């Protein structure tokens, strides 16, 4: 008797049943832990304590502040902008934070896909190239303001993750 695909499936069944999907609660906990880690890294950079995240600095309006509604797509967009800014600073202080933001964005995509709302990969600022002069003229100020605002945004994201944000 020929069993073909059925026999192969039954032979693979023990292996297939062993594979488990990552529980969404674990992904959410990992996301929160990574946010706390990034906030701690920002706190460890001593010069970021001098500026309030709400302070307005002329020429640095492209750095996002807090948003009233933070959906998963808005969180990803905000993190993409911060990642683009930090990468352009070429500072030793922010290399690991930039890498952590990439990992955080991946976790947000996992959370979104678990809610059946896959996020398109968000891009950073489209007019970012025109800001090169601002960045070169004020690297230190840009770093301080960006890290301060990023820290506030991450703390807000941490609070909102408990409320199970929408797509």
From Swiss-Prot:
Residues 1-21 form the signal peptide. Coiled coil: none annotated. It is found in: Secreted. The keyword Repeat does not apply. One of its GO terms (molecular function) is hormone activity. Its main location: secreted. GO terms for cellular component: extracellular space. Keywords: Disulfide bond, Obesity, Secreted, Signal. It holds the Pfam family Leptin. GO terms for biological process: activation of protein kinase C activity; bone growth; cellular response to leptin stimulus; energy reserve metabolic process; intestinal absorption; leptin-mediated signaling pathway; lipid metabolic process; negative regulation of appetite by leptin-mediated signaling pathway. Disulfide bonds join 117-167. SUPFAM superfamilies: 4-helical cytokines. The keyword Metal-binding does not apply. Key player in the regulation of energy balance and body weight control. Once released into the circulation, has central and peripheral effects by binding LEPR, found in many tissues, which results in the activation of several major signaling pathways. In the hypothalamus, acts as an appetite-regulating factor that induces a decrease in food intake and an increase in energy consumption by inducing anorexinogenic factors and suppressing orexigenic neuropeptides, also regulates bone mass and secretion of hypothalamo-pituitary-adrenal hormones. Belongs to the leptin family. This is Leptin. The lineage of its organism: Eukaryota, Metazoa, Chordata, Craniata, Vertebrata. The gene is LEP.
